[in-house]
Amino acid sequence: MLVDSFNRVIDYIRVSVTKQCNFRCQYCMPTTPLDFFDDEELLPLDNVLEFLKIAIDEGVKKIRITGGEPLLRKGLDEFIAKLHAYNKEVALVLSTNGFSLKKMAKGLKDAGLSRVNVSLDSLKSDRVLKISQKDALKNTLEGIEESLKVGLKLKLNTVVMKGVNDDEILELLEYAKNRSIQIRYIEFMENTHAKSLVKGLKEKEILDLIAQKYKIMGMEKPKQGSSKIYTLENGYQFGIIAPHSDDFCQSCNRIRLASDGKICPCLYYQDAIDAKEAIINKDTKMMKRLLKQSIINKPEKNMWNDKNGGTPTRAFYYTGG
C-alpha cells in the first residue's frame, strides 16, 4: 500500500503517453504550433508497462491514460490489453478529445478499457472550432455514439468558459441525460500557457444556471475523487469539478507519470521526480524507490491560492491534466 506523509492512501495514477494533441484548446495550449511535438522522445510503452506493474503491485487500483491526446499514441490497444491481462481488477480509464474515438472504440473496449472520458465543450460546430481550433464536433459526437454502441462506459467533461460556452450548460446536460451519460462541469484551471485567454465559471454560477430549469435535490462528495455529484429531481446525476471553489486535497489519492518520465505528486506542484532513466532501463528497484519517494514528496495542499506560485509553469499537457 502506498501511503503519503499525510496518511492518504495513493491508489490512482494518471499516465500521460504523449504530449502531442490534434487540438489547440483555449484552456490548454492555444498558441502552441501543431508541429511543436513532432520530435517528442516517447517512453516505450513496454517500459511504461513495467513501471505500472510495480505501481499495481504496490496497491494502485486505478490507472487513467491521458495526454496530450492519448489516441494519437501508436500501440495503445496492445498496451491497454497487457495492463488488463496483468491485473483485471485494476480500473483502466482514458481521457480523450474524442476525435479518433469512433474508429478506436471497439478496440479499446476489447482490450479491457473500463471507461472513456470525452471532452465536449459545445454542441455547436463553430464554437468547437473556436475553442479547439479544429473542426471536430462531428467526429467527437460520432465517437460518443460508437462508444455507446460497443458498450464502452462514458463520462463527458465540459470546461465552462464565460462568454464562450456558458450558455450551453443546460443543452449539454440534456444531451448527456438523454444518453444516460454523466456530464461533469469543470472550473477552468489556470496555467501559464492559457492564463490570460480564458475566464471560467465557478461552481455556484454553474449550479445557479442549472437551477433555472431543474430542481437540485442533493449533493454527495465521494471519499476519493475530484468531483461533487449532484442529483436532479428526475434522478439524473451530474458532476462538478471545482478546484477553485472547494479543493479535494484532503482526500487526494493520485499521482501522475508525465510523458517525459517525471513522476508528479500534484498537478499544481512544480517539483517532480525524474524516473526516465529507471524506466528506460527497466530498473525495478529504482522505479520502486522513485515511486515511493514521489509519494513521500506529495504536498498536503496544492498551491492554488499562493500568489507567489499558484499558477504552474509546467503545462497540463505535459503531466496529463
UniProtKB/Swiss-Prot annotation:
Query: Quick one: which residues bind S-adenosyl-L-methionine?
Result: Y27, G68, S119, M189
Record field: catalytic activity: GTP + AH2 + S-adenosyl-L-methionine = (8S)-3',8-cyclo-7,8-dihydroguanosine 5'-triphosphate + 5'-deoxyadenosine + L-methionine + A + H(+)
Q: Which UniProt keywords apply?
A: 4Fe-4S, GTP-binding, Iron, Iron-sulfur, Lyase, Metal-binding, Molybdenum cofactor biosynthesis, Nucleotide-binding, S-adenosyl-L-methionine
Which amino acid positions bind [4Fe-4S] cluster 1, per UniProt?
C21, C25, C28
Q: What does the record note about the cofactor?
A: Binds 2 [4Fe-4S] clusters. Binds 1 [4Fe-4S] cluster coordinated with 3 cysteines and an exchangeable S-adenosyl-L-methionine and 1 [4Fe-4S] cluster coordinated with 3 cysteines and the GTP-derived substrate.
Pfam families given for it?
Answer: Fer4_12, Mob_synth_C, Radical_SAM
The record places domain Radical SAM core at: 5-233
Per its Swiss-Prot or TrEMBL entry, what cofactor is needed?
[4Fe-4S] cluster
UniProt record, GO biological process = Mo-molybdopterin cofactor biosynthetic process
Name the enzyme group at the top EC level.
Answer: lyase
Biochemical pathway = Cofactor biosynthesis; molybdopterin biosynthesis
Highest taxon of the lineage? Bacteria
- Listed GO MF terms: 4 iron, 4 sulfur cluster binding; cyclic pyranopterin monophosphate synthase activity; GTP 3',8'-cyclase activity; GTP binding; metal ion binding; S-adenosyl-L-methionine binding
Q: Where is GTP bound in this sequence?
A: R14, R64, S95, K155, R254, I255, R256
InterPro entries tied to this protein: Aldolase_TIM, Elp3/MiaA/NifB-like_rSAM, MoaA, MoaA_NifB_PqqE_Fe-S-bd_CS, MoaA_twitch, MoCo_biosynth_MoaA/MoaC, rSAM
Entry EC no(s)? 4.1.99.22
- Give binding positions for [4Fe-4S] cluster 2: C249, C252, C266
Q: What does this protein do, in the record's words? A: Catalyzes the cyclization of GTP to (8S)-3',8-cyclo-7,8-dihydroguanosine 5'-triphosphate.
Which family does the similarity line name? Belongs to the radical SAM superfamily. MoaA family.
Quaternary structure per UniProt? Monomer and homodimer.
Tell me which NCBIfam families the record gives. Answer: moaA (TIGR02666)
- Name under which the protein is recorded: GTP 3',8-cyclase
**Species name:** Helicobacter pylori (strain J99 / ATCC 700824)
